[in-house]
């Protein structure tokens, strides 16, 4: 089936697959609702939601640009707009620049601290795709990139980045490494052949164990966060439910089948949503 130019750009941003935007949105909302005691400023909320959409789209574009010479050798990615020739490298870079500018125009309506922090976020978004060629730990860089909205959210709401923001940052970074390792398990065999590095390759036969340890660390630190902020019992019920989803994910990846690993990755959307409900319900109940 022939694809129009507009459809190709839409696919390039993965707007047809919103899971990445959701996984970036949930921790942003965690931070906004915690920083604002459950009632974030509407202007700030809209800016951050739109910023998530623009920056996630920009991240997908620069990722496909970085992978344009190898995606054609992977069955799952061979039909993407860049390797298939529907979009040129120059067009992709121009589109990336437009998305970044749109994001920056949004953040310019925030305070100075938020604007300063945003520059680091842009660097992380650009760096991640290229890390897959130089280190087996690109998921760590993605963890930083997908967590950077957290200190930005606190800065936007309170003009400071307290210790709880950095604890939440670590929690989300560990969670990101866990679920992106699940995602990397899907393409592990292809990645080995074409020289792409990932934690799935680095961890090898210990992949499931390390993912489990990361998930346990996330749960433990969420409990620490709840204790520090004196969150209500509603919050802990949410953490218990999230633990149940982590157990389910471990069951899914036990045989390392591609489809099951991808299903485990997708399941993390429910984890992020549950934690958001737990946080927002708890802080609203207490306010």
Swiss-Prot record:
Q: What is its EC number?
A: 2.5.1.39
Where is the protein found, in the record's own terms?
Cell inner membrane
Pfam families, per the entry:
UbiA (PF01040)
Pathway involvement of the protein, from the record: Cofactor biosynthesis; ubiquinone biosynthesis
Task: Give a GO molecular function annotation for the protein.
Answer: 4-hydroxybenzoate polyprenyltransferase activity
Q: How does the entry describe its membrane topology?
A: Multi-pass membrane protein
Write the record's keywords in alphabetical order, separated by commas: Cell inner membrane, Cell membrane, Magnesium, Membrane, Transferase, Transmembrane, Transmembrane helix, Ubiquinone biosynthesis
Instruction: Provide the cofactor list for this protein.
Output: Mg(2+)
What's the catalysed reaction?
Answer: all-trans-octaprenyl diphosphate + 4-hydroxybenzoate = 4-hydroxy-3-(all-trans-octaprenyl)benzoate + diphosphate
Q: Where do transmembrane segments lie in this chain? A: 19-39, 42-62, 95-115, 136-156, 166-186, 210-230, 233-253, 264-284
Q: Name one GO biological process term.
A: ubiquinone biosynthetic process
Q: InterPro entries recorded for this chain?
A: HB_polyprenyltransferase-like, Prenyltransferase, UbiA_prenyltransferase, UbiA_sf
Does this UniProt record's set of keywords contain Transit peptide? no
**In the UniProt record, which is one GO cellular component term?**
plasma membrane
Q: What class of enzyme is it?
A: transferase
Give the family, as the similarity comment puts it.
Belongs to the UbiA prenyltransferase family.
Which PANTHER family does the UniProt entry name for this protein?
Answer: 4-HYDROXYBENZOATE POLYPRENYLTRANSFERASE, MITOCHONDRIAL, PRENYLTRANSFERASES
Its biological purpose is as follows: Catalyzes the prenylation of para-hydroxybenzoate (PHB) with an all-trans polyprenyl group. Mediates the second step in the final reaction sequence of ubiquinone-8 (UQ-8) biosynthesis, which is the condensation of the polyisoprenoid side chain with PHB, generating the first membrane-bound Q intermediate 3-octaprenyl-4-hydroxybenzoate.
Q: What is this protein called?
A: 4-hydroxybenzoate octaprenyltransferase
Q: What is the lineage of its organism?
A: Bacteria, Pseudomonadati, Pseudomonadota, Gammaproteobacteria, Vibrionales
């Amino acid at each position: 089936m022939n694809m129009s130019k507009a459809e190709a750009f839409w696919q390039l941003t993965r707007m047809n697959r919103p899971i990445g935007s959701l996984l970036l949105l949930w921790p942003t909302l965690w931070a906004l609702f915690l920083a604002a005691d459950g009632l974030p400023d509407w202007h700030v909320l809209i800016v951050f939601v739109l910023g998530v959409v623009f920056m996630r789209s920009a991240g997908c574009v620069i990722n496909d640009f970085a992978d344009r010479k190898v995606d054609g050798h992977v069955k799952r990615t061979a039909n993407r707009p860049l390797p298939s020739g529907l979009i040129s490298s120059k067009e992709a870079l121009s589109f990336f620049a437009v998305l970044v500018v749109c994001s920056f125009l949004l953040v310019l309506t925030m305070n100075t601290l938020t604007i300063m922090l945003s520059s680091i976020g842009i660097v992380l978004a650009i760096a991640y795709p290229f890390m897959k060629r130089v280190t087996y730990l690109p998921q760590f860089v993605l963890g930083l990139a997908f967590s950077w909205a957290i200190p930005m959210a606190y800065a936007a709401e309170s003009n400071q980045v307290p210790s709880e923001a950095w604890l939440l940052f670590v929690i989300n970074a560990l969670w990101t490494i866990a679920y992106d390792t699940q995602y990397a398990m899907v393409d592990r065999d292809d990645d080995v052949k074409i020289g792409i590095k990932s934690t799935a390759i680095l961890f090898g036969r210990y992949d499931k164990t390390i993912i489990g340890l990361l998930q346990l660390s996330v749960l433990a630190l969420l409990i620490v966060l709840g204790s520090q902020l004196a969150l209500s019992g509603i919050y802990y019920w949410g953490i218990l439910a999230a633990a149940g989803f982590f157990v389910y994910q471990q069951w899914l990846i036990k045989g390392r089948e591609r489809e099951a690993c991808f299903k485990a990755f997708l399941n993390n959307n429910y984890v992020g949503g549950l934690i958001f409900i737990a946080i927002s319900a708890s802080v609203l109940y207490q306010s």
